[in-house]
Structure formats: structure tokens, C-alpha cells
Amino acid sequence: MSWELALKTVLRVAEPLFAGDEPPCAVIGSVASALQGCQLAPRDLDLLAARPEEVVRFAELMWAYAPAQVEHPTGHADWLSSEEQPLSIGPDDYGFVWHFGRWLVDGVKVEMAHIAAPEGFPMSADGAGIWEAGPEIWPHLRHVLFAGLRVPVVPLEIQIQTSMSRGLEERTAQITAVLQQSSCDRDLVQKALSKAHRKAFDALIDGPAD
């Protein structure tokens, strides 16, 4: 069971959705962090689509990994895609509209989503930072090499906002350490971070490297 095997499978099965300079799908979450040098052990593979249509297409390509039927549990965390119900579509309790699928690939949960925020959701221009699963990531995608392939990922400069807002101290430290050792895009960081997190990040990034 490894995220590397799951990612290789996804890139083979759904290669057109991740190819080119402006792909319609990208890797986010802990796997994106690991691909960019963070010392993490991802337990699942999170994927994001620019439009709902790409989630539908991904589900079609993943047909071999969808059982005919699944006895769906009441808890969303254990829901799996099936031939009968390949996607879960609809609003959550906070007004975000999801197109979502989840498959088990080589023992790893692979999740693909498009998430439409409710009207009035704050954006970077409002000082709220860039939401890692939102529409503002697409102009900033970065490509990394993995198994001889160019893989589109959300940059660490955007992921740091998610990590800090969720209070993930270990991941924040990992991302900061990589950014200290690489060519950190400070302009993107300033746009990606909410006003509440900018000062704290500046103190971290300008501190001693591990």
C-alpha cells in the first residue's frame, strides 16, 4: 500500500486530465507536499478538477476501480464510488457544492473533487488568502517530475495557508523548511496567505533553516 503506486496508476489511467501546460486537474493535499520535497507519509491521494466535467470524466476513466455496488455507510468518510453511484453531487452543510468521487487504488483512497464555494466566499483580493481547493490555484500550478512524468501540483506557497489555517504545525514546519531551501515565490506567498497569517509566516521563513 503506497501513495506512489496509487499516483502512478492514476496518471496511467487518466493521463489526459493531468497532461499539458494547463491541465484541468491537479494533485493537492499531502501528496502534493511530498512531491515538492516535504518529508511526509501521505495516507491518501487528493485530486482537484477545474470544472465538474473533469470529475465526471475521471469517474468514467476509473471504471475498473469501481465495484458494481457499495453498501454506502452513513459517514461520508467511508463512502466509495461504484458503478451504481460513481459520484456524490450536492451541497454540504456550509453551502459548498461538491462533485466528488472516491476509489481504492492499491489500498490507497483516491479522491477527486470539484468544489464550488458559496456566493460571497472571501478570496485573496479580500485578504482571505488562496483556498487550496478553490479556483484561484489554477494560474499558479507547478509541475514536478515523478516516475518520468510531469505532474501538476498546487505550490507549497499556497499550501502553507491551508496548513497554518488548520493548525498543522508539523506540516507547516515541513513546508517552511522546503521553502527556505528553494526559490520561494514571496509574492505568491503574500497573495496566498491571509492577513492573519502573513506576519507569523514571515517570522518562520526568515528564521534559521533546519
What are these regions (language model features)?
Residues 1-210:
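Compositionally biased terminal segments of proteins
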